């Protein structure tokens, strides 16, 4: 290519003198040749190129001399000639100096615009196309995008095989896996028809349309199997579509005994590739290059179904775990509700017990008045119903002590008690306004045996037995048996009065203490003590006058219960 001839129309060659001294030899003056590209159908691109673009196969050359007699159709060029391409971006026009157009080119000052040398990125910005991320798509050569021409191989960076930043998309299509560069998933790609391989099939190589110069990614040559290889039918892998040459090629490898070695090498390469992806995934976040490698390997070897199967298995496991989690959560909620209910019941029971404990104890009812009870030996005689209660009249004189008040004795019941210790004969008395509550029989102080009987509480004497009196002599006989009696009616607390009366009484006297029951008519006289003194002497006779006497109680034991 050093002495290649460029065949272009005469009017399409523009010679631009470069900066130099005017006095120098014109033959040594460097010139710039601006090539107007024309459609060329040539060589191996005839089968796949239908875009009518020209193939540039020119390096930097210098015209040795230009003479008037030399035909312009044949220009001999050398390395001193500088080639420039007219480019456009929107409405702006500039010249791309190819010798300065080195990889990666985005920030390299290789565009001459308004007599200024600027970078392609700056040129796109001045042209108002800065919104486009890919500067190669914004710049056009002869109406064709610069990227498309570079992908098709019509133009490339200057000395790209020697100077490469590894941040570009190489347009040198090396079919060797070690030198292949992987595209980034998700970017627009264009399919470029490459030369026919040895087996006669046409290989499609997916080239990304998105530039990676700005991203600054460094593509490692170890990322093998990054280029998706397919037949012209796409991803069909049926053995029927394999050409005869390909079949013979692999059959020859098997015949010479290299198949095992080839398979082992391929396996090692793939394992190293995947191992590198795993190591990078541990050390750093997942990168775009790793995603590209995995995607290409999966598609190349048809492993997408395996990947989907793994995803389905994980999805099923997650769903089962979610169901188990929901079941456990429901069971825990149920247990929580039961515990809350039990705690509430326990709290109610505790409150009830506390209320019972703190409840004030009710005061016991006052004891009832003791009742007279008859012993088992007591003989109860069933009396005939009396027509009238017997009336007894005391004929003997009754004297009243000064401390008392005089009152009528007509309605006072009188009891004739025996002085003996036991039994005591009690005659029935008529009911009246005053009832005996307490009766005390006090014997003489000189008596050897105590003859004191206390009858209480405040209840009238019960009639235990009664017998009809035969005649009045019985009452007289009983009267003769009674020693002089003093009747004392007093309230509780006046015990001293009883003692005084007892001390002043004569020998053989009997004192009866009478506490009358409450009388509504006698409320105004409450609190007054009345002492009734009756002296019954042995020589006096008591005559009992009664209209009817049918009942009599004698020889009766009186049992008194105290509180």
UniProtKB/Swiss-Prot annotation:
Modification N-acetylalanine, positions: 2
Keywords: Acetylation, Coiled coil, Cytoplasm, DNA-binding, Metal-binding, Nucleus, Transcription, Transcription regulation, Zinc
Region (Disordered): 360-385
Coiled-coil region list: 304-355
Binding site for DNA: 129, 133, 136, 147
Localization per record: Nucleus; Cytoplasm
Residues bound to Zn(2+): 103, 160, 164, 168
Residues annotated as domain SAND: 72-156
GO molecular function terms attached to this record: metal ion binding; RNA polymerase II cis-regulatory region sequence-specific DNA binding
SMART domains given in the database record: SAND
InterPro entries, per the entry: SAND-like_dom_sf, SAND_dom
Entry-linked SUPFAM superfamilies: SAND domain-like
Listed GO CC annotations: cytoplasm; nucleus
Listed GO biological process terms: regulation of transcription by RNA polymerase II
Subunit structure: Homodimer, and heterodimer of GMEB1 and GMEB2. Interacts with TRIM63. Interacts with the glucocorticoid receptor (NR3C1) and NCOA2/TIF2. May interact with HSP27 and CREB-binding protein (CBP).
Chain's role: Trans-acting factor that binds to glucocorticoid modulatory elements (GME) present in the TAT (tyrosine aminotransferase) promoter and increases sensitivity to low concentrations of glucocorticoids. Also binds to the transferrin receptor promoter.
Protein name: Glucocorticoid modulatory element-binding protein 1
Source organism of the structure: Bos taurus
């Amino acid at each position: 290519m050093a002495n290649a001839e460029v065949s272009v129309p005469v009017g399409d060659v523009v010679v631009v003198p470069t900066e130099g001294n005017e006095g120098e030899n014109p033959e040594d003056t460097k010139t710039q040749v601006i090539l107007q590209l024309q459609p060329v159908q040539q060589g191996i691109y005839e089968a796949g190129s239908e875009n009518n673009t020209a193939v540039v196969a020119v390096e930097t050359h210098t015209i040795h001399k230009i003479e008037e007699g030399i035909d312009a159709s044949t220009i001999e060029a050398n390395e001193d000639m500088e080639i420039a391409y007219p480019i456009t971006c929107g409405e702006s026009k500039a010249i791309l100096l190819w010798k300065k157009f080195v990889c990666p080119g985005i920030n390299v000052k290789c565009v001459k615009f308004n007599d200024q040398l600027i970078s392609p990125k700056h040129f796109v910005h001045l042209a108002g196309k800065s919104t486009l991320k890919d500067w190669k798509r914004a710049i056009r050569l002869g109406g064709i995008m610069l990227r498309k021409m570079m992908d098709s191989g019509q133009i490339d960076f200057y000395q790209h095989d020697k100077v490469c930043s590894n941040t570009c998309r190489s347009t040198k299509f090396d079919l060797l896996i070690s030198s292949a560069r992987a595209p980034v998933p998700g970017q627009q790609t264009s399919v470029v028809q490459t030369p026919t391989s040895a087996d006669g099939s046409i290989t499609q190589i997916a080239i990304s349309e998105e530039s990676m110069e700005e991203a600054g990614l460094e593509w490692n040559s170890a990322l093998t199997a990054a280029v998706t290889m397919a037949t012209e039918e796409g991803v069909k892998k049926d053995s029927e579509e394999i050409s005869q040459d390909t079949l013979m090629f692999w059959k020859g490898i098997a015949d010479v005994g290299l198949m095992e070695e080839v398979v082992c090498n391929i396996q090692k390469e793939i394992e190293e590739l995947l191992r590198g992806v795993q190591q990078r995934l541990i050390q750093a976040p997942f990168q775009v290059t790793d995603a590209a490698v995995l995607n290409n390997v999966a598609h190349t070897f048809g492993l997408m179904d395996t990947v989907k199967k793994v995803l389905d298995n994980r999805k099923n496991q997650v769903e089962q775990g979610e169901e188990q989690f929901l079941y456990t959560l429901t069971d825990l909620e149920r247990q929580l509700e039961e515990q809350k209910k039990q705690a509430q019941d326990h709290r109610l029971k505790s409150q009830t017990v506390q209320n019972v404990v703190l409840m004030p104890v009710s005061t016991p009812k006052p004891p009832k008045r003791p009742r007279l009870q008859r012993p088992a030996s007591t003989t109860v005689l069933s009396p005939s119903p009396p027509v009238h209660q017997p009336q007894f009249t005391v004929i003997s004189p009754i004297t009243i002590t000064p401390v008392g008040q005089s009152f009528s004795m007509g309605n006072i019941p009188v009891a004739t008690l025996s002085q003996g210790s036991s039994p005591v004969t009690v005659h029935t008395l008529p009911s009246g306004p005053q009832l005996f509550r307490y009766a005390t029989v006090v014997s003489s102080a000189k008596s050897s045996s105590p003859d004191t009987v206390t009858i209480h509480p405040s209840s009238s004497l019960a009639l235990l037995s009664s017998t009809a009196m035969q005649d009045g002599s019985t009452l007289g006989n009983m009267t003769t048996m009674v020693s002089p009696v003093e009747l004392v009616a007093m309230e509780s607390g006046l015990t001293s009065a009883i003692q005084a009366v007892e001390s002043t009484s004569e020998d053989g006297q009997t004192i009866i203490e009478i506490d009358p029951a409450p009388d509504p008519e006698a409320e105004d006289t409450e609190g007054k003590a009345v002492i009734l003194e009756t002296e019954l002497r042995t020589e006096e006779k008591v005559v009992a006058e009664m209209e009817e006497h049918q009942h009599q109680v004698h020889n009766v034991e009186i049992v008194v219960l105290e509180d």
